[in-house]
A protein has these predicted regions:
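Intrinsically disordered, low-complexity terminal regulatory regions
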Residues: 1-33
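Terminal low-complexity "docking" segments
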Residues: 31, 35-45
Length: 158
């Protein structure tokens, strides 16, 4: 299977970022730098956590990772390659909720505007839309692809 064509296909249909990811420091550090706004709010977007998850990821499972900011990633392995899909959001940005979140984590209110810009750059999608589209894309490339199960990971919520 051509990995680049698969990723382009999924990215174009859903309007979302997708990358193949190796369990090495360089690719995980790069992902963290590009996608993690604040480690205390997104501990599961860090290279350290993604390394742990990749080592323990099971075949035929979509892992939906949700952070404190309510941004989401999906990790899955297909045809001997692991992919990260996202980030994406399910709801519009709420200034009030984010102000409360920042206060509860003892972060300055001055990062609210950059946080809104960060949040608003992601497509608003539902998991069911992503699941159906990605599974159909997989079956386009490898017709006997089995159904994938779902596992939601909410990380270090207290």
């Amino acid at each position: 299977m051509n990995e680049k064509i698969f990723m382009g296909f999924v990215a174009n249909i859903l309007g979302i970022r997708i990358c193949s990811i190796a369990n090495d420091n360089a690719s995980l550090d790069s992902f963290e730098q590009q996608n993690c706004f604040e480690k205390t709010l997104q501990p599961m977007y860090t290279a350290e956590y993604l390394h742990y998850l990749l080592e323990n990821a099971k075949k035929e499972v979509f892992y939906e990772i949700t952070d404190y900011l309510n941004t989401n990633l999906i990790l899955f392995c297909f045809d001997n390659t692991c992919y990260l899909l996202g980030p994406y959001v399910k709801n519009t940005f709420s200034s009030l909720e984010m102000q409360e979140l920042l206060a509860s984590h003892k972060l300055p209110a001055s990062i609210l505007r950059p946080l809104k810009l960060y949040y608003d750059q992601f497509p608003q999608l539902s998991y069911s839309m992503i699941h159906g589209t990605v599974l159909a894309a997989m079956r386009t490339f490898i017709p006997n692809t089995p159904e994938f199960s779902y596992r939601k990971l909410t990380g270090f919520h207290e």
